[in-house]
Amino acid sequence: MHTTTNFLDEDTCNYILSELTGVSCAWYYTPSVGSVDGDDGFMFGHIFYDHRGKCSDFYDVIVKPIIYKAGFTEQHLLRAKANLYTNQGKAIEHDYHIDNPVQGNLYERPAGVILYNLTTNNGYTEMKTGEKFYSNRNEAIFFDQSIEHRSVTQTDTDLRINININYEYPNSPSTE
């Protein structure tokens, strides 16, 4: 588990944020955050890539710079999505979960998570092991997909936006 500050160049970070907050980007309401049928709050999401392949016109300009900077290619990609949390006047702790679109099960092969923050605020991602990673603009958090984690909403800004990318480790048997 580690973080990289100033993960992308400032122009790319600004461009990604402007695209995600512009009028052309559709955000979709998600009635629960940590589990499919939980009552742990809500968020908005935008899927770039999942088991169906590319799902968004923003894929090339948002996902590719992140995965290439992280050192892997599209063949390693499992899922990529953006998360948008609104300020609800108090910190909402969502349910712990592992990232996987298939009912919370681990991916079949070793996989990692990149959580790329586009905004700075007092919202954070908390690992079940106790570590907290506050939302710092242009910072990427890297961790193993098997680690349970949760998001906690911010109270000091209107929006918290991050990009969540799940990927097979490049040296995984299926990607060699």
Residue ranges and their predicted role:
Residues M1-H76:
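Non-heme Fe(II)/2-oxoglutarate
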Residues H2, F7, F142, N164-N166, ...:
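Charged, amphipathic alpha-helical segments and their flanking helix caps
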Residues F72-I92:
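A short glycine-rich, His/Asp/Glu-containing loop-to-beta-strand
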Residues K90-Y96, P101-Q103, R109-A111, N117-N136:
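A short beta-strand-loop-beta hairpin characteristic of the jelly-roll/cupin
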Residues D95-Y96, T125, E148-D156:
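Short beta-strand His + acidic residue motifs that chelate non-heme Fe in jelly-roll/DSBH
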Residues V113-Y116, T157-P173:
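A short hydrophobic beta-strand segment most commonly corresponding to one strand
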Residues F133-H149:
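Conserved metal-binding segment of the jelly-roll/cupin
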